[in-house]
Amino acid sequence: MTRVTYIIYRIVYGLVKLFYPKTEVLGAEKLPADACIIVANHAKMNGPIVGQLYYPRKRLIWCAAQMQKLREVPAYAYQDFWSGKPGAVRWLYKLLSYIIAPLSVCIFNNADVIPVYHDSRVINTFRQTVKALEEGTDIIIFPEKLEKENPILYAFQENFVDVAKLYYKRTGKRVAFVPMYLAPALRQAHIGKPVSFDPDTPIREERTRICRQLHDAITDIAESLPLHTVVPYENMPKRCYPKNRGEA
């Protein structure tokens, strides 16, 4: 981090806050007193933006480590954001993925994030996460993967639950996972009831149980809200975006 990149980041931050719709976070009274892990739908870039701008407590957000590396941004950004675009314009988005790389590196190396790795370096992700929790900082995770489970929410990558095991080993405390549903169309984020980690249950079973309960809770929150368009995890034309439930 340099002073110049930090100044650029603050300018971008200010512009995003100026033009991005103000989002109301509802249900904050359900948050536990201790630091917790928020698990939410990604909703494209809406999830990280809302987490950074409007989450009511001190927090760090898990982000793909590739977004902090100049050489790795283009391939990751194209695949994650634009690979579903029509073939005739994909070349334009491939070019755009290179253009945004320097800005991405600037933003994600200055924002309140923890880089997430998918190799042996993941232990660094876990250690930073546990340290943050010990210091009273909430963690926000968007664990969806490209495996459709229902119209609202894709299936979860489950290994993030292992952080709770390491946290318990270090502190003797049971961290709570808290579901949150982001509804950009309503300009709202809704927090649900916490799900507590059980250190006495085998970790494989805990991964499944916690992810299932969180997934169901987020889906239930979405379905309980007024009819609106859901921003899905998968890249697709906006005309294909689903509703949160069938119209009456």
Locate the predicted segments by residue.
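A generic local structural motif
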Residues: 22-26, 47-48, 101, 126-127
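Non-catalytic C-terminal accessory region of glycerolipid acyltransferases
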Residues: 118-248
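Low-complexity, charge- and small-residue-enriched intrinsically disordered regions
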Residues: 16-26, 106, 110, 243-248
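Flexible, charged surface loops at secondary-structure boundaries
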Residues: 29-34, 55, 132-134
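Helix-to-loop junction immediately C-terminal to a conserved catalytic motif
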Residues: 5-6, 12-44
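Catalytic core of membrane glycerolipid acyltransferases/transacylases, capturing the structured
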Residues: 34-118
